[in-house]
């Protein structure tokens, strides 16, 4: 038994070691010198026939990344005007404003993950300070005075997940409130207790509000599984994003569940939602999604959103800025009322440490005023501009606070009812906290944070367990009965993958303008740097290897070999890099034309912010990478030495990710080989049980919104079919265990062999080795399907 235990410990240690090696492979890649080109005589520096001479100097890969950054920033700036011009206007044949924005509301709800049905709650679950046992005062109240009492409560939201927080009960109930804390606050802080507190909840209760204060995801940071340091918010966001859910959606869900109960408790009374800082962000989203809310108060949050990419990553809503800045969200609350309280929000700086870096600052009064003017402008033709009001002065600075300003509260209460505001003014000391001595034990505050986090994490993991069935249902319309029916029925899925998951730039591409420069002169091949134009500011760059046996010109098969994370084309050509073993050069020596492109995933946070910027527009890194590859295959197909019907794709690691996505959307690639990456991709992204998961690592950009409900790697391989597809897999590769790889590949095998009747077009090679090119089975696969005998 001891021997078995020892073996298990050794196996687990080996597993973690391999995960460690895999996670640090990018660092090994980055350490290799950039300049691996031959030192050629000046007279030999010539361009490839049919191209212009490349004169660009310096690090072209760095310029490529910088150019894409400029391109994305321009697209973000342009989105402001696009959103304004595309906003619904009254039609000559009538129609209400609510009808005009109905689809926009549904689209926003989907983007923030409101895709699950809430549990019907019958009543609040009341907890006492001592776990539902009445205290020595004979009351289950956490605290009380002569105007109100405070209960600790829970309420069901989704099957298996409950919200928790405080319920502040006034002596006379005139309205209901969901008051959302900032992420630095516990519900008790809004009752005047502790550092960074406010008495907003007490003010609202003394005005007659039945106040619900939900627990929200905290900014608490810690190393997760001893690895990447991140907030509770990011920890939940990572899994949620891939599953088609979102942290913002969870908060909106629990607010809407609270409103369900408020409407049962006080069915004939108005309801408002309010919050400061992070609470303002959540309140705004709740006001958009729940039309039962009579008034929304957004404090310390409202302003332009074109720099959400620099904020904490849980603020990342895929496709947000295609339709929704804060102005559009504000306009969607109309014809109900919105009060914007333009006080500064929290100032937050989150260091990376493996998690995503992010900053929160402001907004200042001028930003809030600017966005408010935009919102009112959207409502002008609908004659609804009076539904949005700014509670503060039009000019000047406002004091920093930890809650809603007096002006914001006063304006909100007056907007609900002038009687409510006047009743508050009758209460002496309505901002006064409840004396600390009146509070019961507060030790449960941290316990509640952890319990809330763990319960929601368990809910997500249960969703992950079941998501395969959602995917299967999503693919029910695929028809494999004949090749023609397969081709027709798979196309809508390809379009969905292109438009909704990857994102497609609907922009005209520039002429190729190929520029080349000879950089390698070897016995069997020559190598050329290549630059192609894609969009304004966007280029494609790589190295083309041309076998000398192709001279005089003969049509050859071409292999596009894609490097991995933090890699460069030269890593695949020279110096026997431990991951690549000069695979591009090996293939050129076998007589293939080889192109090694530079992909965008280089320079750590520089490229990761490209993903953040892309996501806001409903795009991803691969939106731009695919546009680059479309130009690459167009140029390769035009080359006299390349057979356009035999252009193959082969990639390792992040290049393996590319091998699953690019050929699925670029049909000019006649086959695809995924090396050192293939696995149960959704599980690898969303699991908080497996040490292999990206939840624990520095790759905060890796997550793709709503992928899990629609596509895993087997489904991506289906988009590649009926073209040949292969997996190259080392047993010691730490990206995933063999069992997970085999499980997902079995689905691919079934599709090709059983459903399409093409068993010879797919295979997997298992070899004893790590995260590396093996170059045995894959070379045979290329030779077979490219109809080429190595020279």
What are these regions (language model features)?
Residues 158, 165-174, 194, 535, ...:
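Short beta-strand-to-loop junctions in surface cap/lid or active-site-entrance loops
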Residues 31-163, 243-250, 260, 291-294, ...:
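Alpha/beta-hydrolase-fold serine-hydrolase catalytic core, especially in secreted/extracellular enzymes
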Residues 1-12, 22-24:
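Bacterial N-terminal signal peptides that target proteins for export
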Residues 258-332, 634-708:
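Primarily recognizes the serine-hydrolase "nucleophile elbow" in alpha/beta-hydrolase
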Residues 215, 299-300, 341, 598, ...:
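Alpha/beta-hydrolase-fold catalytic nucleophile elbow
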Residues 174-265, 302-314, 551-638, 683-688, ...:
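Cap/lid segment of the alpha/beta-hydrolase catalytic domain
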Residues 174-175, 207-210, 269-270, 291-295, ...:
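Loop/turn elements at helix/coil->beta-strand transitions in domains of secreted/extracellular proteins
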């Amino acid at each position: 038994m001891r021997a078995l235990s020892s073996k298990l410990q050794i196996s687990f240690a080996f597993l973690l070691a391999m995960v460690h090696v895999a996670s640090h492979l990018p660092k090994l890649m980055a350490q290799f010198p950039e300049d691996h080109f031959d030192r050629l005589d000046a007279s030999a520096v010539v361009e490839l026939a049919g191209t212009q001479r490349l004169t660009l100097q310096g690090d072209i890969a760095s310029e490529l990344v910088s150019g894409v950054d400029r391109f994305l920033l321009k697209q973000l700036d342009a989105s402001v005007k696009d959103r304004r011009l595309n906003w619904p206007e009254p039609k000559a044949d009538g129609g209400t404003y609510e009808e005009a924005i109905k689809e926009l509301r549904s689209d926003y709800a989907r983007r923030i993950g409101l895709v699950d049905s809430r549990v019907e709650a019958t009543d609040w679950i009341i907890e006492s300070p001592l776990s539902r046992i009445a205290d020595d005062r004979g009351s289950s109240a956490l605290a009380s005075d002569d105007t109100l009492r405070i209960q600790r409560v829970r309420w069901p939201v989704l099957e298996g997940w409950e919200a928790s927080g405080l319920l502040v009960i006034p002596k006379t109930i005139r309205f209901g409130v969901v008051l959302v804390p900032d992420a630095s606050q516990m519900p008790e802080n809004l009752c005047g207790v502790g550092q960074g507190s406010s008495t907003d909840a007490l003010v609202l209760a003394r005005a007659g509000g039945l106040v619900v204060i939900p627990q929200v995801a905290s900014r608490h940071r810690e190393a997760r599984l001893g690895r990447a340091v991140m907030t509770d918010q990011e920890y939940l966001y990572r899994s949620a994003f891939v599953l088609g859910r979102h942290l913002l959606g969870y908060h909106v869900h629990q607010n809407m569940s609270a409103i369900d109960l408020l409407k049962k408790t006080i069915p004939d009374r108005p309801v408002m939602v309010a919050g400061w800082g992070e609470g303002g962000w959540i309140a705004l989203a709740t006001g958009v999604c729940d039309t039962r809310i009579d008034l929304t108060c957004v404090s310390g949050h409202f302003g332009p959103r074109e720099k959400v990419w620099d904020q904490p990553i849980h603020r990342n809503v895929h496709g947000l800025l295609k339709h929704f800045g804060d102005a559009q969200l504000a306009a969607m609350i109309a014809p109900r009322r919105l009060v914007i309280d333009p006080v500064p929000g929290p100032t937050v700086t989150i260091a990376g440490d493996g998690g995503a870096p992010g900053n929160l600052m402001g907004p200042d009064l001028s930003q809030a005023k600017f966005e408010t003017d935009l919102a009112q402008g959207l409502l002008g033709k609908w004659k609804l501009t009076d539904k949005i009001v700014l509670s503060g002065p039009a000019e000047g600075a406002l004091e920093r606070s930890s809650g809603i300003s007096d002006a914001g509260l006063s304006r909100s209460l007056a907007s609900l009812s002038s009687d409510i505001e006047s009743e508050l003014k009758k209460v002496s000391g309505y901002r006064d906290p409840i004396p600390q001595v009146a509070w019961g034990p507060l030790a449960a505050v941290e316990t509640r944070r952890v319990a809330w986090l763990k319960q929601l994490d368990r809910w997500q993991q249960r969703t992950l367990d079941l998501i395969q069935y959602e995917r299967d249902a999503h693919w029910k319309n695929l028809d494999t009965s004949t090749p023609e029916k397969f081709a027709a029925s798979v196309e809508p899925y390809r379009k969905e993958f292109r438009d909704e998951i990857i994102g497609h730039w609907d922009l005209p591409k520039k002429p190729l303008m190929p520029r080349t420069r000879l950089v390698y002169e070897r016995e069997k091949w020559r190598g050329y740097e290549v630059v192609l134009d894609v969009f304004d500011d966007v280029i494609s760059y790589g190295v083309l290897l041309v076998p000398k046996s192709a001279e005089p010109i003969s049509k050859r098969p071409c292999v596009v070999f894609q490097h991995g994370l933090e890699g460069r084309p030269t890593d695949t050509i020279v110096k026997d890099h431990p991951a690549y073993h000069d695979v591009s050069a090996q293939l050129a020596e076998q007589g293939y034309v080889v192109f090694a492109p530079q992909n965008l995933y280089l320079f750590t946070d520089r490229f990761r912010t490209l993903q953040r910027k892309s996501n806001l527009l409903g795009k991803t890194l691969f939106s731009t990478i695919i546009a680059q590859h479309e130009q690459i295959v167009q140029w390769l197909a035009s080359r006299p030495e390349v057979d356009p019907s035999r252009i193959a794709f082969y990639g390792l690691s992040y290049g393996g990710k590319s091998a699953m996505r690019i050929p699925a959307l670029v049909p000019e690639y006649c086959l695809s080989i995924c090396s050192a990456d293939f696995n149960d991709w959704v599980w690898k992204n969303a699991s908080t049980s497996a040490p292999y998961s990206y939840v624990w690592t520095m790759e905060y950009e890796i997550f793709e919104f709503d992928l899990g409900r629609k596509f895993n790697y087997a489904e991506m391989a289906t988009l590649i079919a009926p073209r040949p597809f292969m997996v190259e897999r080392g047993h010691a590769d730490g990206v995933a265990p063999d069992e997970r790889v085999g499980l997902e590949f079995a689905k691919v095998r079934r599709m090709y062999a059983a459903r399409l009747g093409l068993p010879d077009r797919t295979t997997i090679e298992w070899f004893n080795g790590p995260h590396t090119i093996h170059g045995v089975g894959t070379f045979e696969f290329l030779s077979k399907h490219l109809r080429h005998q190595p020279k």
